[in-house]
């Protein structure tokens, strides 16, 4: 059964290239305009290579990190746009001599230690006859949990919100059910998420879950290289269009209007549309760039705020592993407190921003220690994902539940406390719901019986004549 797993999540050449670029970045001997595109090219190549093999979760995590920690910042440093509060707070050399090695080594270690799954082979033996029932069952549970979450706060609310995401796992079951209405059912499972995003103009969760569902669906068959490049190109164009309209779209919603998302995107992306104006391009770079927050941390720590020396990591582990009654003062998930503390910048009431693992690593140990912490984080994530994939060999249907465990880990802006909370509590919820579902609607593994044919007995000519 081990043929279903690839021991590494990237080619040896890709891993070596990432490491070399990271070391060159630490010296800043070569322009970042050359180094960052190389890193992006390697990660995009590894992502597309496994896109039709199985959900490339580690590669997707790497791609998002590279885009937000390296590509966004290099664009921000190399143009004349005005960014105001969202400016880079340290010079380019200072930022990239930390961010380039920390990011590339984080990605390289994670992909080297992690594994990739061969989805088609893994799921080929599953009996899919109960998949529609499971999808409906998970939607009912998810909706009940969603309404229950509105009545609670704190840890209990977080638990119900986790359970409410069972609807999206139900959508994956629908996609693999082979039912003639499977796409309609999957769309219905995602409908509240889509409507919520469109109504308030907050698209992050919607985009991430849609990307995960697309990866599951895409890997059901092999695609040509051209088809994969076309898919990535169209996705990139869609994301760019969404970023450039987002500000105006939200402004219209605040005025009580009902803007059309599709119409605005088409208008902005036309040859004479607003998407190509300096202001819109600057806004798109700001949306992509997580580096402005990281640079603010580097500017503020240790000049105004001393290094945390692992303090936030201890709080994250405590928050993830200890129940509230054992640690009543444990840290709650959310980035507002760390953002204000480590950047020195203020946030409006009700606004929360994370400083990202890269920013938090620097806030704890500075450049040198932060690089090693990011390597350790990559190793931890890669090992945990590999361990999860090995469990799938015996329980293939749990493959559909992986997003519930690793959802927050994919993001590039979430802090360690959020990541560890999702990993620990998401794993518990995923296992509990998986077994509860299996108890009611078991997914059996088909058993293939090889027919044996009796050997043909050869009769000598003498005996035949007799």
Predicted feature residues:
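Aromatic-rich transmembrane-lumenal/periplasmic boundary elements in polytopic membrane proteins
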Residues: 231-332
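Hydrophobic alpha-helical segments
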Residues: 153-154, 350-466
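Membrane-embedded catalytic interface detector for glycan/lipid assembly enzymes
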Residues: 79-250
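Hydrophobic, membrane-inserted alpha-helices
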Residues: 14-22, 39-43, 141-146, 166-173, ...
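N-terminal "leader" segments that precede or initiate the main folded domain
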Residues: 1-116, 190, 213-238, 423-430, ...
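Central hydrophobic cores of alpha-helical transmembrane segments
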Residues: 58-67, 185-195, 209-212, 228-236, ...
